[in-house]
Amino acid sequence: KKDGYIVDSNGCAPECFPTNXGC
């Protein structure tokens, strides 16, 4: 998860998809 992003129920920001790298 990246601080400062709205996250989904998994704690990942939409901007992280599809690779989730930043989560």
UniProtKB/Swiss-Prot annotation:
Expressed by the venom gland. Pfam families: Toxin_3. The keyword Disulfide bond applies. GO terms for cellular component: extracellular region. GO terms for molecular function: sodium channel inhibitor activity; toxin activity. Keywords: Disulfide bond, Ion channel impairing toxin, Neurotoxin, Secreted, Toxin, Voltage-gated sodium channel impairing toxin. InterPro entries: LCN-type_CS_alpha_beta_dom, Scorpion_toxin-like_sf, Scorpion_toxinL/defensin. Belongs to the long (4 C-C) scorpion toxin superfamily. Sodium channel inhibitor family. Beta subfamily. This is Toxin Acra2. It comes from Androctonus crassicauda.
